[in-house]
């Protein structure tokens, strides 16, 4: 059995919340000296030897603790204790501290107060039990008083009504008792203060203690709360005992209770909520970008680091860069301010298609024609037409279909004429595609693309009746306000006329005289080459239109482009025949590449 074990202990104390506070106990040396010197004698009310027992127990406890400290601190600790100016007496001890230390419920060096928070005028229970079956609560009377939890402790003053109301309920066997306590009639000045509920347990044979019981008597009764004291009193019972509750803090409402570990969340403003949402979206987009980048790397495709840039802006930037490079390396081409506009130029389409052809030389002709059609469709989608323009386009398409039915018969009769012209264009393309020096290769590719595109335009307009050629060409280039407009139209008509004349001669003479007018000839004084260089400079304005367009001009351009694309299949078949004929007669030619020829003949962009 543990020496000085508590006879009666508190098993449960009700509260709204429990807080832990560290407590600084008084110096042990002053307590021992006050006991040994007899400064505050301990006298029991009934003259029982409990006072001497308490004194002996306290001395034994405190002397043992003092010896441990003296071994650690030695002389330094003794000098420090001797220099103390204040001496504590037993009356200044906190009853809660004395109870926890004497009953060995806590150790002095790590003493902690467990503060119980209760609501004003709300009852809470304090449960007690006896650790010895010989003690029966039916033989005792319980009385409660209220003290301030301070050093030195003092009673809570009142005038008429006691601030503490209580009701005790004893169990059937008498080993347990529950005291329902309610604290009231305290002003707001006491809110936040801590109190102690002292439970006086007195035998029925002795009078009950008064409400203003001295602190010394309470401390004496706390010392008698031990099983050893009960055994020493046998066969006489213990007459007075005291049990001190845990410190109590009183609040007026439950909302005032500060819950430890649960912070109060401040209501977020609209700006904070919006910022949090944007951060979540940004984090989600970053994760998606990583997945997309991984997919690009798996398929060996270059990942665009600016995925939110619009495709239209990128196309415009590429077209402007290509037009600027074409002006610097054009080789005799004329550049004006319209090249910097957002309208796509022919050079950008030619360069893009040329790059595509170099990477796909082994593809079939059908796949390449499908890619060209898809590129034209993408360009058409980038232009926004109004409702009125769409109606005019439908009307033009209907006229185009009617016109195509008439020209299908004419195209069968003009099969021989187209073969000679396509052979000359094929020979020029083959000459341009021969190996040259690396410094001049880029310029020759651009010039060959320009020539091939112009030859395609000439071939397309050959199917237009002669009576309508001049009007259609004039309307198509009406947007160019240049001094060379009339000369451009005249040169265009002359070229068409020369092509028709050459086709007639080649059909009668078997194409023997076609070598003199070959565009791909490398003679020093070739008239066709000089005419091509002159015409190339004049036609540059035609393929670089201005940014401000007239709705009627767009319709005419659409009409002419649709008409040229409708006869694309017949032109390619005729060009293949002309290449086979031209291989037997021209002394400068090598075997042409049909895939490069069809790729270089680009359709006109629809503006």
From Swiss-Prot:
GO terms for molecular function: sequence-specific DNA binding. Residues 62-84, 334-451, 568-602 are annotated as: Disordered. GO terms for cellular component: nucleus. GO terms for biological process: regulation of DNA-templated transcription; sorocarp stalk morphogenesis. Residues 364-382 have a biased composition (Acidic residues). InterPro entries: CudA-like. PANTHER family: DEVELOPMENTAL GENE 1062 PROTEIN, REGULATOR CUDA, PUTATIVE-RELATED. This is Developmental gene 1062 protein. It comes from Dictyostelium discoideum (Social amoeba). The lineage of its organism: Eukaryota, Amoebozoa, Evosea, Eumycetozoa, Dictyostelia.
